Amino acid sequence: MKNIELKKFFNEDDSFEQNGKMIYLVPLKEFMKTEEFASFSPVSRKDKNETTGETSITKCQFLNSSAWTDVHPHMIIDKTKSEKTIKYVDLGEKAVGGEFPNIEYEIMVRVNEDGTLNRDFVREVKKGRFKNKEGKFVDTWYYKKGYEHFCPVEYPRYYRDPSF
């Protein structure tokens, strides 16, 4: 699907003006059908099965960041070849149903008037490392400012604990 076709999802209630241009929120599931989304490079996530010892590799296009009791979704838009540094944009959310505390959310993407991804707030995060017992460096997930943990996922989720 071409990005311009996202215009059918534009809604004045889900839009705002920023630096003289309109920004629209469209559902992530629709943005994932575009050619632009298909051009983003995924990040590899290695998972080791502790019982069998086998390692599986999953290609991930999203990050879930967790800090305290909140999980926030992000979309990966670029990476270095070694995947030590990745660039991402934050995804928004919109309440679409349910009642407190069981509110249902839909994940939204910020796009420009022509349907292309809004890149005004591209952020960067680096892979964390630690030394194991043998003195070798082991890469872990991604960290920012030492407290926010970023985990690559196939599809993002949103969660906020209202009791915190």
Regions found by a protein language model. Name each.
Residues 79-86:
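Short, conserved beta-turn/loop elements at beta-strand boundaries and strand-helix junctions
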